[in-house]
Amino acid sequence: MDQFFEHLNAGEREAAVALMADNAEMRIHVGDNSQLLRGVERVGGWFLRADKGLKMIPADIRDTGSTYECDVLVVRPGVNSQHLDATFRVEAGRITAINLAPR
């Protein structure tokens, strides 16, 4: 996961997406709703299309082996920063699931 955040925060989005499994899933919670993206094309595309300058800074990391939980500070130019609860599942060295929810 350290590599994922390093690549993402350095603007190397393609390298960050390359760490995802082909069958990756991402659930994004907004208000009372959530959206589920399936497949590396959709999940990776979300990161590739994000605002230029997007940074995701992890803190309060809890790494339990296959699950990586953290508080993520999301910073985007021109927008207020936001804290998210983030959970990542990693299997065989690939990110297979991401869950992002506002704190």
Which ranges hold each PLM region?
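Structural motif
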Residues: 20, 64, 91-92
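Short beta-strand segments enriched in hydrophobic/aromatic residues
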Residues: 20, 74-76, 102
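Surface-exposed, charged secondary-structure patches
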Residues: 38-85
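Short beta-strand edge/turn micro-motifs at domain boundaries
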Residues: 69, 81-103
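Hydrophobic/anchoring residues in structured secondary elements
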Residues: 26, 61-63, 100
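Short, aromatic-enriched amphipathic alpha-helices that serve as compact interaction elements
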Residues: 1-12
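Short, well-ordered alpha-helical segments enriched in acidic and aromatic residues
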Residues: 12-27
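A short gly/proline-enriched turn/hairpin at secondary-structure junctions
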Residues: 25-35
